Amino acid sequence: MSDYTRANFGGLSEGEAQFSMTARALLDELTDLEGKLRAKLDRWDGDAQAAYWNYQKEWDAAAKDMQNVVAQLGVAIREAHDNYQAAERANTSIWAG
């Protein structure tokens, strides 16, 4: 049995697009949620408001980290796609003479 690698270029392109769309959708959803919360939070005061904003900073940082990971996965998929295509071109050129 021989080992070989098979790449689905269309699938890789689709995967990259899905990760990019997911990263944007995540940011849009969080921005929308924060906008809805701000209207209600403006009525809070004192320790409750301060506690919320402290946690909000942590959530924002975690959401940004998550968005960065999703975006990096999209980049990794694109790089894999490009590398597989380059390898296929190189292998094809061997037979082209």
UniProtKB/Swiss-Prot annotation:
Pfam families xref list: WXG100 (PF06013)
A GO cellular component annotation in the UniProt record: extracellular region
Entry keyword annotation includes Secreted: yes
InterPro entries assigned: ESAT-6-like_sf, T7SS_ESAT-6-like
Record key words, sorted: Secreted
Domain of life (superkingdom): Bacteria
Compartments in which it is found: Secreted
Primary location recorded for the protein, binned into one broad class: secreted
The keyword Secreted belongs to this UniProt entry's keyword annotation: yes
Function noted in UniProt: May help regulate assembly and function of the type VII secretion system (T7SS). EsxA disassembles pre-formed EccC-EsxB multimers, possibly by making EccC-EsxA-EsxB trimers instead of EccC-EsxB-EsxB-EccC tetramers.
Quaternary structure and partners: Forms a tight 1:1 complex with EsxB. Forms a complex with EccC and EsxB, probably wholly mediated by EsxB.
Family per similarity comment: Belongs to the WXG100 family. ESAT-6 subfamily.
Protein name: ESAT-6-like protein EsxA
Gene of this entry: esxA
